[in-house]
């Protein structure tokens, strides 16, 4: 099938399955952005696009998503639920528990928005790798996906997943066909929660946001879009090590930098960047964020590792 045929297939499914009002959670990533545009074309004012600020997002994320909504003349709401999410995650260290809590909180917020909008349907941008990792069709569960394993069994909304059988390369091809950005990196639904190993605190979130911005800025400044890794980000580890600031001993956090090349997210190989780029990233992080004094580079492929650390 051609890319345009895939687009027609998705729009037909939305038209057939959604008979009333619907909402969609838009993260600003490739999958939900594509689905929100297609659903908007089909449903018009019967669709409400919701962006939930969980407090686990990157610097500038809210402004970027608002701009996207307005550029495409969408019916939207931005909900600041950051206090609720951070309170629910207090003291939680297990990655699966984090994902389940975030999934439940997310659905609670969406149910509230759906009730206010009188929506009966929830559109989700779940794609094939999401449910495969979550144990779909007799596969062992690798980890619960926020669009799959984190959802409560009893939902008030009827779930519609038009992208369920598509892979990331197909999503990008459809986005290209529609004139949407195709350089958007995948960003996990649980956000920075799965890039902080261990308990999530406001201090750790601040450190990781700043480190993430440095990693993204350095790579995007050094490399043309076609040269960039498929995904690149920072991970804050629950490990403190001894370092030196000036002539004084310092005890600071460790950050891992992850760069991965992939086509469909099912497999991936670690990127082999120049030493100069890695050195620039490490020096900038440790210079600008004194509480981080060590930077390591993840050289693990998928498999055996997953792309995200948690």
Curated annotation (Swiss-Prot):
Claim: Zinc is one of the keywords in the record: no
Q: Which EC numbers characterise this protein's activity in its record? A: 6.3.5.2
SUPFAM superfamilies in the record, alphabetically? Adenine nucleotide alpha hydrolases-like, GMP synthetase C-terminal dimerisation domain
Which Gene Ontology molecular-function terms are recorded?
ATP binding; GMP synthase activity
- Residue numbers binding ATP: 27-33
Q: In which pathway does it act?
A: Purine metabolism; GMP biosynthesis; GMP from XMP (L-Gln route): step 1/1
Q: Among its keywords, does the record have Repeat?
A: no
Q: Which UniProt keywords apply?
A: ATP-binding, GMP biosynthesis, Ligase, Nucleotide-binding, Purine biosynthesis
All copies of the GMPS ATP-PPase domain together span 1-187
Q: What does this protein do, in the record's words?
A: Catalyzes the synthesis of GMP from XMP.
Assembly state and interactors? Heterodimer composed of a glutamine amidotransferase subunit (A) and a GMP-binding subunit (B).
Q: What is this protein called?
A: GMP synthase [glutamine-hydrolyzing] subunit B
Question: Which lineage?
Answer: Archaea, Methanobacteriati, Thermoplasmatota, Thermoplasmata, Thermoplasmatales
């Amino acid at each position: 099938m051609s890319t345009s045929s895939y687009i027609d297939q998705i729009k037909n499914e939305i038209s057939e399955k959604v008979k009333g009002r619907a909402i969609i959670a838009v993260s600003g990533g490739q999958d939900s952005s594509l689905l929100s545009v297609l659903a908007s074309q089909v449903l018009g004012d019967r669709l409400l696009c919701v962006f939930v600020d969980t407090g686990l997002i990157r610097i500038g994320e809210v402004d970027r998503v608002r701009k996207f909504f307005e550029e495409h003349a969408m019916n939207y709401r931005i909900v600041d639920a950051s206090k609720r999410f951070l309170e629910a995650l207090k003291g939680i260290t297990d990655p699966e528990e984090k994902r389940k809590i975030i999934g439940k909180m997310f659905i609670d917020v969406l149910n509230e928005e759906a009730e206010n909008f009188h929506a009966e349907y929830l559109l989700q941008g779940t794609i094939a790798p999401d449910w495969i990792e979550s144990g779909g069709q007799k596969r062992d569960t690798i980890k619960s996906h926020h669009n799959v394993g984190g959802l409560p069994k009893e939902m008030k909304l009827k779930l519609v997943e038009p992208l369920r059988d598509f892979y990331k390369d197909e999503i990008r091809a459809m986005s290209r066909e529609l004139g949407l950005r195709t350089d958007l990196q995948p960003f996990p639904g649980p956000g920075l929660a799965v890039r902080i190993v261990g308990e999530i605190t406001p201090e750790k979130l601040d450190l990781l946001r700043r480190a993430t911005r440095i990693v993204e800025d350095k790579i995007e400044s050094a490399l043309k879009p076609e040269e960039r890794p498929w995904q690149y980000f920072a991970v804050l580890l629950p490990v403190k090590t001894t370092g030196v600031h000036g002539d004084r001993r310092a005890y600071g956090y460790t950050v891992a930098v992850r760069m991965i090349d992939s086509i469909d997210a099912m497999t991936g190989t670690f990127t082999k960047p120049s030493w100069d780029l890695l050195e620039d990233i490490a020096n900038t992080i440790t210079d600008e964020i004194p509480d981080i004094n060590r930077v390591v580079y993840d050289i693990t492929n998928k498999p055996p590792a997953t792309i995200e650390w948690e």
